[in-house]
């Protein structure tokens, strides 16, 4: 199944000059969604990890489904003020400002191996902040898995030295 056909291009969103890769048609189609999760799990089947860490919002959808299928724990990473317990955070740059990612301070035990999952690898800024959060808590990043990679933004350069798995590449 060609999963790329389920990704909708939205020009000039969230701002002029950006083509947004909308995964909601893929999520709506049960066969495509199942295929995407199965194939993303296959991409990391040879990696050793204890937890799946994923940011809101679309990262939750993919990360939680993968954690369930692989029999791993799931750790949510959220925007400020959304987690009820004490958190640590990292700031990162967006094309249009600065954002923060928060994780519970006890979410990852020292030495635990982590798979980071998100929907789209664009500039690598979010992934870089997630890596810093995992390391801040004493975890080790085993690999990163993404449904979509925007290779024309050259995100792998920013994440050099990490094992990056992607299903759909633009």
From Swiss-Prot:
Pathway: Purine metabolism; AMP biosynthesis via salvage pathway; AMP from adenine: step 1/1. It is an enzyme of class 2 (transferase). It is found in: Cytoplasm. SUPFAM superfamilies: PRTase-like (SSF53271). CDD domains: PRTases_typeI. It comes from the Bacteria. InterPro entries: Ade_phspho_trans (IPR005764), PRibTrfase_dom (IPR000836), PRTase-like (IPR029057), UPRTase/APRTase (IPR050054). GO terms for molecular function: adenine binding; adenine phosphoribosyltransferase activity; AMP binding. GO terms for biological process: adenine salvage; AMP salvage; purine ribonucleoside salvage. Its EC number is 2.4.2.7. It catalyses: AMP + diphosphate = 5-phospho-alpha-D-ribose 1-diphosphate + adenine. Disulfide bonds: none annotated. It holds the Pfam family Pribosyltran. Coiled coil: none annotated. Its main location: cytoplasm. Catalyzes a salvage reaction resulting in the formation of AMP, that is energically less costly than de novo synthesis. Homodimer. PANTHER family: ADENINE PHOSPHORIBOSYLTRANSFERASE. Belongs to the purine/pyrimidine phosphoribosyltransferase family. This is Adenine phosphoribosyltransferase. It comes from Thermotoga neapolitana (strain ATCC 49049 / DSM 4359 / NBRC 107923 / NS-E). The lineage of its organism: Bacteria, Thermotogati, Thermotogota, Thermotogae, Thermotogales.
């Amino acid at each position: 199944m060609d999963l790329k056909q389920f990704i909708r291009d939205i020009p000039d969103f969230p701002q002029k000059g950006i083509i947004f890769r909308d995964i909601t048609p893929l999520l709506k189609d049960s066969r495509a969604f199942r295929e995407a999760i199965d194939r993303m799990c296959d991409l990391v089947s040879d990696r050793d990890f204890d937890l799946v860490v994923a940011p809101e919002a679309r990262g939750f959808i993919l990360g939680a489904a993968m954690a369930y299928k692989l029999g791993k724990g799931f750790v949510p990473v959220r925007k400020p003020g959304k987690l009820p317990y004490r958190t640590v955070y990292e700031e990162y740059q967006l094309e249009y400002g600065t954002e923060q990612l928060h994780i519970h301070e006890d979410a990852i035990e020292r030495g635990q191996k982590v798979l980071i999952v998100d929907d789209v690898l664009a500039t690598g800024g979010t992934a870089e902040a997630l890596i810093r959060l995992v390391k801040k808590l004493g975890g080790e990043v085993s690999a990163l898995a993404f449904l979509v990679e925007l290779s024309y933004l050259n995100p792998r350069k920013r994440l050099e030295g990490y094992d990056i798995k992607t299903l759909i590449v633009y």
